[in-house]
Amino acid sequence: MLIDDSSDDNFFHEREIKKADLTNLVITKNSGKEALEYLKSKTDPRSDLIFLDINMPGMNGWEFLEEYNQLDKELQSEAIIIMLTTSDYPDDLAAAKMWSSVSDYITKPLTKEMMKDIADKYFK
């Protein structure tokens, strides 16, 4: 699942994920709230991997994590959550490390090489 308020980023990242053959189905949501509503109402297909933008209006990535961690465990589906950012702001990296549900923190844009590294790290 891609959670990002930028439709352009979602379009580009979905293309990179498909090029890397990580999955056949990429679910995109334009806000944290929209993603939570989807996760609460849909048990299948569950997301194995969530790319979560940090800076979004309304509900940012950190606020999404607070709500996500309160979901029933079966709705969380043990997804690998990777935080996405456009900056190398050290405080964001430090904050990401404080969340046990966050597996990784990377700077946009996603590339085919990054997708290969993610596949090797989490799915092999």
Q: What role is predicted for each listed range?
A:
Residues M1-D8, H13-I17:
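Conserved acidic segment of CheY-like receiver
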Residues T28-E37, G61:
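Helix N-cap/capping motif at the beta->alpha junctions
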Residues E37, W62-L75:
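Short amphipathic alpha-helix used as the core "switch/output" element in two-component signaling
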Residues D44-F51:
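Active-site beta3 strand of CheY-like receiver
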Residues M56:
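Receiver (REC) domain active-site loop signature in two-component systems and cognate sites
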Residues E63, S77-A79, S87-D104, D117:
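Alpha4 helix (beta4-alpha4-beta5 surface) of REC/receiver domains from two-component response regulators
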Residues T107-K108:
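A Lys-centered signature of the CheY-like receiver
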